[in-house]
Amino acid sequence: MKYTSAELREKYLKYFENKGHKIVPSASLIPENDPTTLFTGSGMQPMLPYLIGEKHPLGTRICDSQKAFRAADIDDIGDNRHTTFFEMLGNWSLGDYFKTEQINWIWDFYVNELGLNPKKIYISVYRGNDHFGIPRDDEAVALWQEKFTEK
């Protein structure tokens, strides 16, 4: 169950292509039409216009492997969580599916496609923000709990 980065990327993109996603190439590391930043720092950054309502020319299901560079992390390089340049795999629903499908698919990808041991998978869920009145994501918590209790 060892994969090179190229094999993992290809497996991920093919998996979501089979779920009806259109594959888009990585956007430039130097963002176009975004004077707020020097570099593309996340997979979401090039998708932002579509996440806030602009129609994507390829439809409502998009998948990519976005190259990202984070200059702010340079001082933290060397620990087990920070890198400067990396690729973010993303599958995007632009008004199509939501949490149930996303959680089911990514679990299937991890466990059945990659063969990961479910007992070694850790999930984080948005805990909310009292200051802004945003509640914890209890729906996602419940959906993930179902995955971890399935036989």
Residue ranges and their predicted role:
Residues 1-151:
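Structured aminoacyl-transfer and RNA-binding surfaces used for tRNA recognition/handling
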